[in-house]
Curated annotation (Swiss-Prot):
Function: Part of the twin-arginine translocation (Tat) system that transports large folded proteins containing a characteristic twin-arginine motif in their signal peptide across membranes. TatE shares overlapping functions with TatA.
GO annotation (BP), single: protein transport by the Tat complex
Domain of life the protein comes from: Bacteria
Identification of the protein by name: Probable Sec-independent protein translocase protein TatE
Organism: Klebsiella pneumoniae subsp. pneumoniae (strain ATCC 700721 / MGH 78578)
Entry keyword annotation includes Iron-sulfur: no
Record's keyword annotation contains Ubl conjugation: no
Length: 68
């Protein structure tokens, strides 16, 4: 009774398509895909900025000389 079979999944999928329609599901899928793409892009930018900051911190400091 608690198992999820393939027939149950197909019935649920058919009901979802009937309720929302294919156009709404296509739009929802596109929105979800662009959200995931934006999230991955933000994560990569964050990693790049962290690497840049780490490289700047590891670089030796230059001596400043002051002439009077």
């Amino acid at each position: 009774m608690g198992e999820i079979s393939i027939t149950k999944l197909l019935v649920v999928a058919a009901l979802i398509i009937l309720v929302f329609g294919t156009k709404k599901l296509r739009t929802l899928g596109g929105d979800l895909g662009s959200a995931i793409k934006g999230f991955k892009k933000a994560m990569n930018e964050d990693d790049d900025s962290a690497k840049k900051t780490t490289a700047e911190e590891e670089a030796p400091a230059q001596k400043l000389s002051h002439k009077e």
